[in-house]
Design a protein with these regions (language model features):
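Hydrophobic or amphipathic alpha-helical targeting/insertion segments
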Residues: 89-90, 95-123, 127, 131
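Extended effector regions of multi-domain proteins
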Residues: 2-12, 99-104, 108-117, 140-141, ...
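Terminal targeting/leader modules
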Residues: 2-27, 33-48, 63-70, 78-81, ...
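Short, non-transmembrane alpha-helical segments in secretory-pathway proteins
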Residues: 23-67, 118-158
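Exposed beta-strand-loop-beta-strand "reactive/processing" segments of non-cytosolic proteins
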Residues: 45-99, 147-199, 262, 396
Length: 705
């Protein structure tokens, strides 16, 4: 039970708060410091450590009022979410500060919950367990000598939930490995036991030991460092460099954290949990600035593993809610994580003492070639009449490391008004020990001698607060449907009639829906009051998403209960300020009884979601049956979804993108065989082989016929 003990509210001091550029900006390092100082001054007698000091998003109505008339409206107050721990006290201190006023608005102890694990919390486990006698004993049983404990490593995971230990203590499970050399990849040498670690007392409180023992593998480590590749024959020598050139720099403008690019304008937020947050996205449609989305972010994810043997049921990481997509974010390297001309944004987080830590280059913003945007040629004059425009895309990205896995998150803006989310998975499989000849049971794949990688899913929750031409929107599900009229009937004589069947959701219950590939199902975020003059249909952005596996853990299972958001592809709820976390605010060690987050907000499902401010929660991802090709390090596996304008623009909004080649029929007749449209020519592309004379190049160029 979540028990709230109301404590002190409203402690005031003179404000010395630094001023932010924009109400949606994440807290700066100076603001984090100032927020920590307010808390420390208010509660000098408490021995507090900080878990979260993060912007509490402004209330939407206040933000929109300010944004519509910034000169006339006061800036929304900077409010700050605090999660702090007090030594020896179970539960978390949850605070809300008004940073502008230098004031504590609320500070209360929430019991029966556990906060996110920070990198600091994770780092303790390995350091401590190496000298714990019961762990050393298990290592020796596994075939590692007691004086080799510096070669023993662990990936610390939150325990998830284990009914033996409940939620009282802050627990981590140590997923154990061995390296014969510090440069080894430990994942080819998993150990078969799992210590349970108390994060606060630094004690190992239990060790899960399997009935069948699996000594540490005697195989060579499966490494991916240069020496290992050398032993396999060395790096390939036939890869020629590809250099990205942007001689005139970038096509986007940056003002603070606001980006303008190709008619789009948006604010790039970032927080410890969701990582990148895209705020207040608008599109300048020939002078009319049209709102598209108020806020889009990755709100949660769950990675359930499919091996039924204890304790593997505990492997179902909520990487955002339990560890934080911001806290785990990488500092990105120029020419490496992103190529071309890059603009970076840093991220600032608190350490346990409330001192700011800055992650340099946490967000990468850059452009890439986007292939052909549109093309048509007329066969009548041997394709001389032709147009071809190439696209450019804007990419806002981050990469976070969730212990073994890397998640690469790309928010991509296209010139036709489409917004895409692409996530690529790389890094290393979570592995476990398997004896020679031992059956996998089908629940995993032997990816290397002595190594099994269990089946699992990566299910993400995308939170979309649409604002299609205004705050009042509806959601409709669209299915390809065939005419009900039989073949031979007047209405469908040839039997070929089909059409898009749109179902507008009225209530929260209506909107609980799953993907249906056979009907090309999609979901439109519509403004029912904005009707397109040609199509007669409402202005919309369509969610096109096909990688939508169902949650495989069964109804009633621990994962099903804890990850309520993942039970369906789409949920829609009425908008509520600061309702961000679909598996609950405090995810570690929730039992799922009751299911937190979305299931609570759904309630009896009768809430109105028609023609109002709504939030669409979309579950997407993939089911991963590991293969040896995923090991020892996984080639990046992409998944992608689109938000596409439909009945929103009068016509193709990218018609004004300068084409690489354009020729009319009359122009082709007049100019004859060889035409170069000088100003648009790509001067860098050239033939790979053979003739390189100027004439030959011109003949094969897209700019000549
Ligand atoms: N994938 C589970 C996890 C994530 C981050 C840190 C530790 C473990
Ligand atoms: Cu995977």
């Amino acid at each position: 039970m979540l028990e709230r003990l109301s404590q002190i509210t409203s402690h005031t001091r003179a404000s010395t708060a630094p001023v932010a550029d924009h109400p949606l900006d994440p807290l700066s390092a100076a603001e984090i410091k100032a927020a920590a100082a307010i808390v420390k001054a208010a509660y000098p007698d408490k021995n507090l450590t900080f878990n979260v000091i993060s912007l509490a998003d402004p209330r939407k109505s206040e933000f929109l009022a300010w944004s519509a008339a910034p000169e006339k409206t006061s800036v929304p107050a900077r409010e700050v979410d605090i999660v702090a721990l007090e030594a020896g006290v179970s539960g978390v201190w949850e605070g809300l500060l008004d940073l502008t006023a230098g004031k504590v608005l609320s500070f209360e102890l929430v019991t029966g919950v556990q906060p996110i694990l920070t990198i600091d919390d994770l780092s303790k486990v390995e350091r401590v367990i190496r000298s714990v006698p019961s762990v050393i004993e298990q290592c020796v049983i596994s075939g590692i000598s007691a004086d080799e404990m510096d070669k023993v490593y662990c990936d610390p995971w939150t325990i998830g939930y284990d009914e033996r230990f409940g939620t009282e203590r802050r627990l981590q499970q140590a997923i154990m490995y061995y390296r014969s050399d510090e440069d080894d990849s430990q994942y080819s040498h998993p150990l078969d036991f799992c210590p349970i670690f108390d994060t606060e007392t630094l004690e190992v409180i239990a060790i899960d030991i399997p009935n069948v023992r699996r000594p540490v593998s005697k195989a060579k480590h499966a490494n991916f460092h240069a020496k290992a590749v050398e032993e396999l024959g060395g790096y390939r020598t036939d890869v020629k460099p590809i250099i990205v050139q942007q001689p005139e720099g970038v096509s986007f403008k940056v003002s603070g954290r606001e980006i303008e690019w190709q008619n789009f304008k948006l604010h790039v937020g970032f927080n410890y949990r969701e990582g990148i947050v895209l705020n207040n996205i608008t599109y300048n449609d020939h002078g009319e600035v049209r709102p598209l989305f108020y806020r889009i972010s990755l709100a949660e994810m769950v990675v359930p593993y499919g091996c039924p043997d204890h304790p593997h049921q505990r492997k179902h990481a909520f990487d955002l809610g339990e560890y934080g997509g911001g806290y785990m974010t990488n500092s990105l390297a120029l020419g490496c994580d992103c190529k071309g001309v890059i603009h970076y944004m840093d991220a600032a987080f608190p350490d346990r003492n409330g001192e700011p830590i800055t992650v340099k280059n946490a967000i990468c913003i850059h452009e890439e070639d986007d292939g052909v945007l549109f093309k048509h040629s007329d066969f009548r004059d041997n394709y001389a009449t032709s147009v071809l425009a190439r696209g450019v895309k804007l990419i806002i990205s981050q990469i976070f490391t969730a212990a073994n896995y890397e998640y690469m998150v790309y928010w991509i803006f296209h010139m036709d008004g489409t917004i895409q989310l692409e996530i690529k998975l790389t890094g290393i499989l979570n592995t476990y020990a398997i004896n020679d000849g031992e059956e996998t049971g089908g629940f995993g794949t032997r990816v290397y001698p002595g190594v099994i990688a269990h089946n699992h899913q990566h299910l993400f929750s995308l939170r979309i607060n649409p604002m299609i031409d205004g705050v009042e929107n509806s959601i409709q599900m669209v299915d390809a449907a065939v005419s009900a009229a039989p073949v031979g009937s007047k209405e469908n004589f040839y039997g070929n009639a089909f059409f898009p069947k749109a179902t507008v959701f009225k209530t929260v219950n209506d909107a609980i829906t799953d993907y249906e590939g056979a009907t090309s199902r999609s979901w439109d975020m519509i403004n029912p009051k904005k009707i397109h003059p040609y199509s007669g249909k409402p202005a919309s952005y369509k969610l096109v998403s096909h990688e939508t596996p169902l949650l495989l853990p069964k109804e009633g299972s621990l994962v099903w209960k804890r990850a309520g958001f993942a039970r369906h592809t789409v949920h829609v709820t009425p908008y509520v300020d600061r309702q961000f976390y679909p598996a609950g605010k405090y995810v570690p060690q929730t039992s799922g009884e009751p299911s937190r987050g979305l299931p609570e907000w759904i309630g009896d499902g009768t809430g109105n979601i028609e023609n109002t401010d709504v939030v669409l929660w979309h579950t997407f991802g993939l089911t991963h049956f590991p293969a040896p090709e995923d090991f020892p390090i996984m080639p990046a596996e992409p998944m992608s979804l689109l938000l596409r304008p439909r009945n929103f623009f009068l016509q193709n909004p990218a018609l004004d993108v300068p084409p690489s080649y354009i020729m009319t029929t009359s122009g082709a007749k007049k100019l004859g065989e060889s035409v170069v449209v000088e100003s648009l020519t790509d001067k860098v592309s050239r033939l790979a082989f053979g003739e390189t004379s100027a004439e030959k190049l011109a003949e094969s160029s897209c700019c000549s016929k």
